[in-house]
Curated annotation (Swiss-Prot):
Modified residues annotated as N6-carboxylysine in this record: 103
Similarity remark: Belongs to the metallo-dependent hydrolases superfamily. DHOase family. Class II DHOase subfamily.
Annotated active site: 251
Keyword entries, A-Z: Hydrolase, Metal-binding, Pyrimidine biosynthesis, Zinc
Listed cofactors: Zn(2+)
Gene from which the chain derives: pyrC
Protein name: Dihydroorotase
Organism: Salmonella dublin (strain CT_02021853)
Length: 348
């Protein structure tokens, strides 16, 4: 990476965790990802989850149809794990190059996860098949028991689900997605080469005070929820250290304004327009720009066993204001950092 004071030039990055939705929303949000990233791991939690090869092929085509001319973008599809998923269908999708990975949502952990897994034991034959195939398991790492405080769900998941699973299937490749706690940061750091993590810009930039003090800020509400400052700092220190098994995963998750600004709002930050510049700002603040390219563009492909993108992206130190909103057919989207000035932006 070359890093003059005003320009950052890096290999074209990938987004290893994104929600592109469907229908009109998909058509609106896809270009914000396809313009910047060479590839993206696409989450399968649509209203009708992606559980079959045919459904994934059809969804992939809808995504590709929404990619503007001139954008070189490859969506990497994932399979939504359910208690009744057919392991043969999953293996077929992996061998045919349709499924890159499979996603484990604990039932009711986040948006459109009611079809999720009730217990790891229920899908153990599928996970054993994935271990044999070398197919990555992507994990939303939170327990959903009613008695567990929402701020403790990730740490509890490590102890009661993640560690027993990894002890049982020692060669299963696992991505601990959107980690939010010092517990998870330490767990991944202490893990072996079969364990990696993605980290979002919002969890690096903010903590729960930013969301709750002086008025509630619904556009910072996401799941896993923002945690204490000590957890934010642990994540920042992990990426600043140059740790090679952590990589970019925005978890960009658009919801229309009326579904966010309501008495029972949806979880998710639509950060695709400003995420790369947000990451750059964090690395700069941590005096860690030397590790920025690896986090964005190299660590993910290394873990997934994929080639690094051939192209390049330049970020320029050019203060720009994030739009207040983005028009939808019958509503609007409020992007992450709406109305705020960002230091780094992608050169068009």
């Amino acid at each position: 990476m070359t890093a003059p004071s005003q320009v950052l030039k890096i290999r074209r990055p990938d987004d290893w965790h994104v929600h592109l939705r469907d229908g009109d929303m998909l058509k609106t949000v896809v270009p914000y990802t396809s313009e910047i990233y060479g590839r993206a791991i696409v989450m399968p939690n649509l209203a009708s989850p992606i559980t079959t090869v045919d459904a994934a092929i059809a969804y992939r085509q809808r995504i590709l149809d929404a990619v503007p001319a001139g954008h070189d973008f490859t969506p990497l599809m994932t399979c939504y794990l359910t208690d009744s998923l057919d392991a043969d269908e999953l293996e077929r999708g992996f061998h045919e190059g349709v499924f890159t990975a499979a996603k484990l949502y604990p039932a009711n952990a986040t948006t459109n996860s009611s079809h999720g897994v009730t217990s790891v034991d229920a899908i153990m034959p599928v996970l054993e098949r994935m271990e044999k195939l070398g197919m990555p398991l992507l994990v939303h790492g939170e327990v959903t028991h009613a008695e567990v405080d929402i701020f403790d769900r990730e740490a509890r998941f490590i102890d009661t689900v993640m560690e027993p699973l990894r002890q049982r299937l020692t060669a299963l490749k696992v991505v601990f997605e959107h980690i939010t706690t010092k517990d998870a940061a330490q767990y991944v750091r202490d893990g072996n080469d079969y364990l990696a993590a993605t980290i979002t810009p919002q969890h690096l930039m903010f903590n729960r005070n930013d969301m709750l003090v002086g008025g509630i800020r619904p556009h910072l509400y996401c799941l896993p929820i923002l945690k204490r400052n000590i957890h934010q700092q642990a994540l920042r220190e992990l990426v600043a250290s140059g740790f090679t098994r952590a990589f970019l995963g925005t978890d960009s998750a658009p919801h229309s304004r009326h579904r966010k600004e309501t008495s029972c709002g949806c979880a998710g930050c639509f950060n695709a327009p400003s995420a790369l510049g947000s990451y750059a700002a964090v690395f700069e603040e941590m005096n860690a720009l030397a590790h920025f390219e690896a986090f964005c563009s190299l660590n993910g492909p290394q873990f997934y066993g994929l080639p690094v993108n051939a192209g390049w992206v330049e970020l320029v130190r050019d203060e720009q204001q994030v739009p207040e909103n983005i028009a939808l057919a019958d509503d609007s989207l409020v992007p992450f950092l709406a109305g705020e000035t960002v230091r780094w932006s992608v050169k068009k």
